[in-house]
Amino acid sequence: MSLIRVNRFGPRGGARKTLKVKKKAAVRQEWDNTVNDLTVHRATPEDLVRRHEMHKSKNRALVHWELQEKALKRKWKKQKPETSSIEKRKLSIMKEILSDQYQTQDVLEKSDHLLTAAKGLFVDVPRKRTGFPNVTMAPGSSRSPAGINQDPGTQSILNESIIEPQALNEVDDGGAESTAHSQSEDSESELPNSLSPHSNRNTERFLHQLKEENSELINQLWTDIQQKIAAQSQRTPPGSPSSELSAEDQKGALNATDAVKRIQAGLQPEESAEPVDSSYVGQVLNTRKPKPLLSKVKRKQDMRALSKQKKNMLSSSTTSADLASSNNSSLDVLKHMIHEVEHEMEEYERWTGREVKGLQGGQGLTGFTLSLVSSLCRLVRYLKESETQLRKEVETRQQLEQMLGDHRELIDALTAEILLLREENGAVQARLQQYMVTTDEQLISLTHAIKSCPVINNSRQESQAPERAAMGRRLVDNVGAPVVNSNVSMPLMLKGEEMVDFPQEELPVKLSQGPPPTENLNLASNFPTHIFEPAVMLTPPRQKSNSEFSPLQDVLRRTVQTRPAPRIPPTVEVIEKEQTWEKKNLPIDPDIQNSSEESRLFTQRWRVSHMGDDLENKSQPQFVSLSQPPQFVSLSQPPCSSPPSTQQSRNPVFSEEPTVLGDGQQLGTADALMHRKDIMARIAELTLQNSAMKAHLNNITSSGGEHGDGLREPSRQGNASEVPANFPAVQSLMPSSMEERIAELNRQSMEARSKLLQLIEQQKLVGLTLSSSPVSPVESPLRAWTEEGKRTIEVSVPGVEASESSKCNTVSPVSGVSSRRSSGAISNSCSPLNATSGSGKFTPVNPRTKQTEKQSEEGWFALSAHLP
């Protein structure tokens, strides 16, 4: 059986297959805006403009100005640079103005934000407003919204500024009505204070809500008032006082302020028999008071109808009461008030001391007005006077305060100055004390120094110019014989002046008081004791007594110490050659040696005494220490002298130096005989001294000749020729006059002292020669040798110009030996050593080159430093 597959759903048979028909898609409906219309949220054109302005850039003007400036710069680049800068100034001014304006706006906005967020220090600054929340109550809820915590200070100020709270408490029947009025007035009084549009919208909403909420309460209060008025009108006729009292009680309660109560309290004791009711006060003072209340209520249209009805009723009752009682009580009340005012004015006038005016009695309104106006005028006048007086007092007080400030500043300045003066005074006193202490110390040290120094008379007498010239001529005439300088100081006994003390710094010769160097101490320890016997004390005496000296030595010591030094010529350089020691051992005649020694002693005394005067001129600050043997320079003048044409010798001219011839030139004619006797006595005393000195000199010479035999040289003839050239010539110059005799005696005493000093120095040199080595008897560690075996010794001799001596001059061998031996000692002293050439030269301080030939003719001796 065969199975055939057949379409199950298809028609049987060979029928045609049918096609499905597609359904059309449902058309989508448009948006239905009828339910929620969103076009109300679309911004209006005004909002769009406002938003557009809000989002504009604030720097638009600045950008515009910058663009203009760039354009101007481009324009200026194209144009010449000499164009005016007016446009640039305009742009700078615009920029300054605009920037200041924008900065001011920013500052104002910032300050506004700060003020809104700031919390005021006082109650009303910034003003605080009472907020009224917009709360929607539930439909079935009778509870009011939650209470708002109000500021009590602001609330009390607002209540007092609008209406008196005591008046509200005194209301009996119309309390609710008064509260309603107070609320309405409170809300109305706050309206003008809100100036912004947002606050206006909020107040409108609040009033609308308040109207809806309180409409029932207001209607109820209004019906109660109408019922009471109707009941009172039924009981009494319209003109009865009860209706007036009932209507006026409310007005009196509303207007019973503190001022009215004070006036009423002042009138009650005077009119205790006739008490004044509050209704009269309200009639007199507040007859037209309801009109401002009505004008306040008319500000809002929502409350207009109810307020009109209520105020019309009140005003009608008030006017009816005024018409009834104005004729009875108004004049009495005014009289009492005027009397009270006048009484107060009289008391014020008495209190201030002004003239008291009597009461002006007047009947009717005319007298009342006159008294009131006069009282007001007086009050105003008194007020002006008090104000003027107050201003004067204020000005006076300001002046006094200014004066007080000035006085305080002066007091402060004086106090500071006094303190400064005190400090300065203390500092000055401290410096004075210190200065006194130092001065005392200096005085003490000066006193000790003066006590330790010898007494020296440094006063020198100077003769007149003609006398100096005459003495110079006399000296020039005696060229062949040696002449002693006339400027030799006289002994102390020949002068009538007082002795003058000099400190150590002003002594003619620097006296060495310090300890000797170690080398000299070692040398002195090897010498015999008889060499250091006391002779002439050129240093201050160290012994406790003068018993160790002989009388002659004591006289000689005092004479040497008290003699001032005369002035001598400038620097002399003595250059000596080193000689062999074989010539020193040859014998020499004692007479020739004495003559040469006298010449050297005079030169040494002359040089040493004149070196001290050089310290005063401060030309050569070199000192000769007398504690060591000085350098001797032989002063000799042979008979034969070279002519000035062949050799230019510089000899000193003593006529330029001041001569001291004695006291005889300064005596008057009246006392001539007395002074001459004194001079003769002095001459005799000097003669005795010279004889004693010569005797002592002969003894010392004989003893010194025994020790000095090894030092003599075989040049007796030269010195023998010098002896008759020196001393006989001196003896031939004895003048006959008194002054010349005094000078001659003075010269002889000086020569004797010089010889004595020379012999003492020779004894010391002999001891040094015997104890020294055979190669160099006295060898100084400070000698300066030249290449040729010569040494240079520089001696300061101020005031003399000298050169090399003439070729005919003969040099004393003993003087040469003495100068060579003493060179080592001078090298240890203050005289400088200078290694120069072998030839001797003299360097004068004040050269006189133009007078060379004249000086060579007039000179009487020459400084000879040549050694054979």
Curated annotation (Swiss-Prot):
This protein's GO CC annotations: centriole; centrosome; cytoplasm; spindle
Compartment(s) where it occurs, according to its Swiss-Prot or TrEMBL record: Cytoplasm, Cytoskeleton, Microtubule organizing center, Centrosome, Centriole; Cytoplasm, Cytoskeleton, Spindle
Bias (Basic and acidic residues) ranges: 706-715
InterPro entries: SPICE1 (IPR031387)
Amino-acid biosynthesis recorded as keyword: no
Record's keyword terms, sorted: Cell cycle, Cell division, Coiled coil, Cytoplasm, Cytoskeleton, Mitosis, Phosphoprotein
Chain residue ranges for the region called Disordered: 129-154, 172-201, 229-250, 291-326, 630-664, 702-722, 805-868
Transmembrane found in the keyword field: no
Amino acid composition bias (Polar residues), ranges on this chain: 190-200, 229-245
Modification type Phosphoserine: residues: 240, 655, 772-773, 776, 831
Protein name as it appears in the record: Spindle and centriole-associated protein 1
Protein encoded by which gene: Spice1
